[in-house]
């Protein structure tokens, strides 16, 4: 058991070394250009992307909410309410997650933390705190691979179930059935596979380039992305490894509250229609 765990940990660490280099679809190009070029497609496959067309309005995704909905997949919440769904991707512990949890607790704001195997193995107390404070801990796979390249159902299931099993070993609880594809890479078959395993796939409708730990945005740069683009029903993606996110989260939540927004759990997402 321990030998297998060590092997999995080594594999996870190797995969995480690629995380900063491959992050999300905006990595290799200018953020604005990639966002603006994301088409309003019907097909659900490829790299998740967004096009922000009107300030304060929900962006257009490269798959429609209706098409994603048939697979219990989301990129928007309730767009009829001034509500925000906070989510954090946690590839590893970088020393900022507890500060983020403190800010969430201060604002009584629920969040979802999408974690990988390394995060649970190296920071079990933080994982237990997330659960104890009422946050969702979601499945970001064990090794953080490109899931769009995994067509085999057994291999896909193993990535999710090994993470779910580790979470249960660590907390004594079942892992909530929310899944986020690593780096936003997915295929329509993946969405079907996740749905068959009882998962809701959660993309996002607002994010910014916050994952380069050695090139963090300033607070003003973060606000310039996150404030004008916020919209009703936003599913916000932030990274828990970001120093800037930890430093501004309290003030950011206050600013959103001053704009009339409240915060909701993914458990409150509207049923897919």
Indicate where each model-derived feature is located.
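Conserved strand-turn element in the central/C-terminal portion of the radical SAM core barrel
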Residues: 181
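Terminal accessory/targeting
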Residues: 1-84, 102-111, 232-273
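Histidine-centered catalytic micro-motifs
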Residues: 136-143, 184, 238-241
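Alpha-helical scaffold elements lining the catalytic groove of polysaccharide deacetylases
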Residues: 63, 96, 145-171, 185-232, ...
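Active-site beta->alpha N-cap acidic-glycine motif
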Residues: 49-151, 155, 159-168, 175-176, ...
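A short acidic, amphipathic alpha-helical/loop segment
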Residues: 99-100, 125-129, 190-193, 248-252
């Amino acid at each position: 058991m321990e030998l297998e765990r060590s092997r999995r940990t080594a594999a996870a660490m190797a995969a995480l070394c690629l995380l900063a280099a491959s992050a999300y679809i905006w990595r290799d190009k200018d953020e604005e250009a990639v966002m603006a070029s994301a088409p309003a497609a019907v097909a659900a496959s490829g790299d998740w992307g967004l096009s922000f067309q009107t300030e304060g309005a929900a962006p257009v995704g490269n798959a429609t909410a209706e098409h994603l909905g048939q697979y219990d997949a989301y990129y928007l919440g309730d767009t009829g309410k001034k509500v925000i769904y906070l989510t954090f991707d946690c590839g590893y512990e970088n020393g900022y997650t507890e500060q983020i949890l403190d800010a969430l607790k201060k604002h009584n704001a629920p969040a979802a933390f999408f974690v990988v195997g390394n995060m649970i193995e190296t920071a079990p107390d933080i994982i237990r705190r997330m659960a104890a404070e009422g946050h969702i801990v979601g499945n970001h796979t064990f090794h953080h691979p490109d899931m769009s390249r995994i067509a085999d159902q057994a291999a896909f299931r193993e990535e999710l179930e090994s993470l779910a099993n580790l979470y249960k070993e660590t907390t004594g609880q079942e892992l909530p059935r929310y899944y986020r594809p690593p780096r936003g890479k997915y295929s329509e078959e993946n969405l079907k596979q996740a749905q068959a395993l009882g998962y809701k796939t959660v993309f996002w409708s607002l994010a910014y380039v916050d994952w380069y730990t050695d090139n963090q945005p300033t607070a003003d740069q973060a606000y310039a992305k996150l404030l004008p683009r916020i919209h009703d029903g936003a599913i916000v993606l932030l990274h828990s490894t970001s120093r800037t996110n930890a430093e501004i989260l309290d003030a950011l939540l206050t600013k959103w509250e001053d704009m009339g927004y409240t915060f909701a759990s993914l458990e409150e997402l509207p049923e897919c229609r």
